[in-house]
Amino acid sequence: MKVRNSLRALKKIPGAQIVRRRGRTFVINKKNPRMKARQG
């Protein structure tokens, strides 16, 4: 999982979902699990 400043590019990838957990924003992608990231 990458820690990134901006999740804007990742949320456009097909299959991406934005999830808020414990005050942090995560992008999870079941179609392409390499595209996981968190912000904050």
Swiss-Prot record:
One of its GO terms (cellular component) is ribosome. One of its GO terms (biological process) is translation. GO terms for molecular function: structural constituent of ribosome. Transmembrane segments: none annotated. InterPro entries: Ribosomal_bL36 (IPR000473), Ribosomal_bL36_sp (IPR035977), Ribosomal_L36_bact (IPR047621). Keywords: Ribonucleoprotein, Ribosomal protein. SUPFAM superfamilies: Ribosomal protein L36. Pfam families: Ribosomal_L36 (PF00444). Belongs to the bacterial ribosomal protein bL36 family. This is Large ribosomal subunit protein bL36B. It comes from Arthrobacter sp. (strain FB24). The gene is rpmJ2.
